[in-house]
Amino acid sequence: MGKTKSRGRRAEKKNKKNEPGFNEDVSNLDSDVTITNQEPLSSSISSTSGIPNTFFGLVDNNELDYFKQAESTLNINAFETDEERQGFINSVLDEAQGKELKLVTNQICSKLMERLILFANHNQLKKIFKQFQNHFVSLAFHKYASHVLETLLVRSAALIEKELTQTDEEKLEKAEEEEAEENSLNNDVPMEDLFISMLNEFKPHLTTMIDHSYASHVLRLLILILAGKELPSSVTSNSTLRSKKSKIARKMIEIKDNEDFDRAFQTPQSFKNELREYCQTIIAGLDTKSARELSIHKIGSPVLQLLIQVEGLVDRERSFWHLIFAKDSEGKDSVEESFVEYLLSESVGSHFLESIIKNDGARPKYIERLYKLYMKDRVLKLAKRSTTGVYIIQALLFKLKPVEVEYILDQIIPELAELISIAENQNLDLANKLIDASISRGNYRRDEIINQLFIKFAPNYDIENPSDNTSTEFIENILQLTGSTLGNTRDDWPTAEERKRALFLEKLMEYDYKCVICTWFNFMALPIERFVQMCFHGVFCHVVEKALIVEPEEPKPIQILRKRLLNIFQGQIVGLACNSYGSHIVDSLWNFTVLLPMYKDRIASELLGDSHRVKESTYGRLVWKNWGMELFVRKKYDWKALIKQQEQEYYGETEDSTEKRTKKPIELKMERLAEEKRRQEEMAERAQSGYTKRKLEEATGTASEKKQKLRGRRR
């Protein structure tokens, strides 16, 4: 007797087909595809935490090879024209039609889908968007699909703005194009409506998305789009969109953003209502305890920071802020005090507090309340917490009232040398922010800040009477030249730490000219080979360039010191001029040699001496032009006129200027000599004209008559 079939499968399949999570593509998988673990193909599996996990099927080997090759072709981008590339993209999209969901959940094919979305036109974008409908939640929680979804959301925001700003003529032209295209009837729905339908899919899952590794990034992007904020790049190091690992991965797979990233988009009025609903939905699922837990959660904290930043657009009560902190009218609370103390001492918590202080979401009175109740009486103690509390103090310097800022400066400046650690590389940022705060307060206590920094970085340097035996401790302690990439022959890229230190020294030189003088002495104390290496270094060359500045009304001792510094460059000019970094330094020497025409002539002569090498170099030709070397070679008088013009600009002697500077004694003496010479020339000219006149009179016979009259008059 034959084996009887088990009954009820058709009915079971029909019931599954009516379920909302059913995916028809999955049910029609090829028979040669094997599925591990025998999971239900189209079931939406919700775990206890409410995270959906829909299985969309596997990509078979033949499809995988094709899509892998297509991804490689797009990555190389060896197309001769944009039309050729667009044709290739169209063919790949045709091949991928109906398979989008299983492609985005595959590690290799998800990269292909991301590239296709970046290059797709508006109709293709809408088509892909529609394929994801009813599955956006599952994609947001997926490791690979979430990245594809983020790219799709950014491009969708750009398309929404374009549809909003379209003129009637553009709309008519678009309608004609759609009529000419196949399947145009499927793309007549506005992108705004498609986007709102997707937003509705996410609403039941918002609280689950907040602390999920992948969905939280999608949620943050949705909030940014709804609020009309700038959508950050997904590859830059300071991007708020992706995690550090994700940004590194994108650089490795060479997926670059298009012009839709790093900008804000115009949004319709309906988006503000959707943002309000999102905020209300999230806050309904939170209480004070859970909100505070999220604020110190590694994944949930950035989402909460963003919600606090944008809630003011739709909620005047600032519900998220008051869910975490007490109202501004309330006094000190022991539970809140413990929570704030934890924020001030823990890395994630301190980053959360710093972020909500720095962004424009919280009202100033909220921040001022927290500061006065829990931080004001221990500013110095918090500044000593080099990995947590110090960042809160730095943020407060630019958010509090001027009186409170000066109070913080008064507390920290006397102890600044103790707070900075050279060995452990701590609190350079604090010194940076103190300088910025001092500048914003009209250089408040500048001399004390500079003295503290010299105590830390150059304890043996005499600020008032610098001597010739000054060591290199100042630039060594700040730049950490020993152990840096300076002088490496392996083409090592300068590190981020070197860039940070170089910028700090540049800021010091802008802040006070004493730091410039100290840097000059340190340059002269360096071996010439080491100094030249700095000029060729990608980061330290900027330090050399920024040090080549001349102070107005420069005293004579400083001018002599400037001449001594210029002597270091002797014999190195041509090499620097032909280098991408050094050429900028040679350009700066034109202004640095003001009032020193002999040194200008020496540098120009050095360039002329090896003119063939200079002119062969791209950078050398720029230096040749900026130094006016053609005039130096052919019209030396005009070149000297350029120097004279520069000196007049330095002294402020222009035709329109009404103020006259006090002239130096040597200038007054030169003017007297010139005036005396002019008088002597006039007297000589008059004598010569009188002699010529007498000779003429003698020749005509009128001289004796005049002579008699003169004698008669004298009698």
Swiss-Prot record:
Sequence segments annotated as region (Disordered): 1-30, 651-715
GO biological process: endonucleolytic cleavage in 5'-ETS of tricistronic rRNA transcript (SSU-rRNA, 5.8S rRNA, LSU-rRNA); endonucleolytic cleavage in ITS1 to separate SSU-rRNA from 5.8S rRNA and LSU-rRNA from tricistronic rRNA transcript (SSU-rRNA, 5.8S rRNA, LSU-rRNA); endonucleolytic cleavage to generate mature 5'-end of SSU-rRNA from (SSU-rRNA, 5.8S rRNA, LSU-rRNA); ribosomal small subunit export from nucleus
PROSITE patterns (alphabetical): PUM (PS50302)
Protein's UniProt keywords contain Phosphoprotein: no
Compositionally biased region (Basic residues): 1-16
GO cellular component: 90S preribosome; nucleolus; preribosome, small subunit precursor
Any one GO molecular-function label of the UniProt entry: RNA binding
Gene3D superfamilies documented for this protein: Leucine-rich Repeat Variant
Keyword Cytoplasm: no
Keyword terms of this UniProt record: Nucleus, Repeat, Ribosome biogenesis, rRNA processing
Stretches forming Pumilio repeats: 95-130, 131-166, 201-237, 285-326, 334-372, 374-410, 525-562, 567-605
Pfam families linked: PUF_NOP9 (PF22493)
Family the entry assigns: Belongs to the NOP9 family.
PANTHER family named among the record's database cross-references: NUCLEOLAR PROTEIN 9
Purpose: RNA-binding nucleolar protein required for pre-rRNA processing. Involved in production of 18S rRNA and assembly of small ribosomal subunit.
Descriptive protein name: Nucleolar protein 9
Record organism: Candida albicans (strain WO-1)
Source organism phylogeny: Eukaryota, Fungi, Dikarya, Ascomycota, Saccharomycotina
GN (gene name): NOP9
